[in-house]
Amino acid sequence: MKVKEAIKITEGFTRTSKMPGLSYSLPAWECKTGSKLRKVKGSVCASCYALKGNYTRYPAIKAAQYRKLEAMKHPNWVQAMAAVIKRQKWFRWHDAGDIQDQQHLQKIFKICRLTPDTNHWLPTREAWIKDHLASKPDNLVIRFSPPMVGQRNDSWPNSSMVVESGATCPAPAQGGKCLDCRQCWDASIKIVSYGKH
């Protein structure tokens, strides 16, 4: 599949200035767990970064995210995603939004298997995914993000957390960029912590 055709099917990718590669953005309004947590004081989702700033300032961004959500139903979505992602060394799933259901997760697993030379990182708040970790491809790191600020999770092989201070993510001290840091993609790092937005 040609890249031009693949981008048309997938509705395009996000290139955030912070990240070392492309990412795929879905509407945070459609997060299954996050939409409930938004109403919970002290939860990470109560101040979701994907529901403010450029994500809401420009209506075209929200419209594009909904087109991407719909694009996942295309019969060639998996192949189209792989056609673009295989050109990337690093890929982040969902700079906004989250896994919608088991079918969505299995499609991501297929894409990872079709792009074995790409390092994939998938942050999620969907706890049910833990039951599917045994079948995940080796080139995919899934980091579970506990719901509350300051909450730690040690039961997953990889997780992340939001903290008020002492974050391990170096991006804030590096002009908001990952630069040469790849903690999030590194399965040997059990927990990555981020400063509260």
Task: Give residue spans per PLM region.
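Class I S-adenosyl-L-methionine
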Residues: 1-197
